[in-house]
């Protein structure tokens, strides 16, 4: 009996160790469990597939409201070199999409504060998404301007960005696709100057059960179908819907931002449209 108990105990320890190893070596891709080293390329494949229809995709996934959410984020940050200042800001927009946030921040600074000196680094891991942003830039006041640069970078590392170099770090609808979200937050903290602001806009968890039921019905029933009809790409839209459900809830994500070293004011987030999306803010002290 003693020997049997010892064998059971040993087996339990082995299973526990194996479970930890499994947890360490694997991650989620939507609802699928995959090796961590495969996720980056799978996510790249999704966004290469949807790059040319990226704005349409966000319209479908948010019923068009993402444009209002982005406008609200930009106005909430209210960034720009003030007329009595000689220090332009250095922005970093990660997982840039087609540049909504990047161009919006520069527009806000220019139109509200007359700021024509602040600079913007636009970063994305996916070269197809970067090309979409570059094409869109050609129709903005920042076309061929030295004030804006596009970089192909992994948001979890940002190897080309020096420590303590950026004033504002923004990321919209991108961080949930990271393999290691905490590593991405740690990197955001690294590249920001003391006093710098981290701002994240991301799909989140609806806080009303009845509304959540309706939202999930819309998400899982209609979104993949519309992806098939609009972009001939059901699988990418299915992944994007599932990735929202796998993303941490508002409180958990706020605590992850704190864990990266940021001061998080108040409860740490602002729900938008009943929690369909949320804005998270952190300050590097």
Where are these regions (language model features)?
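N-terminal auxiliary segments of SAM/dcSAM-dependent transferases
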Residues: 14-45
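Class I SAM-dependent methyltransferase SAM/SAH-binding core
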Residues: 89-158
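Conserved alpha-helix/loop element of class I SAM-dependent methyltransferases that forms part
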Residues: 53, 63-89, 104, 108
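C-terminal alpha-helical "lid/dimerization" subdomain adjacent to the S-adenosyl-L-methionine
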Residues: 204-260
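A short SAM/SAH-binding and catalytic strip from SAM-dependent methyltransferases
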Residues: 167-181, 204
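A short acidic, Gly/Pro-enriched loop at the edge of an enzyme's catalytic core
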Residues: 156-169
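A short glycine-rich, Lys/Arg-flanked "PGG" loop and its adjoining helix->strand segment in the class I
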Residues: 182-197
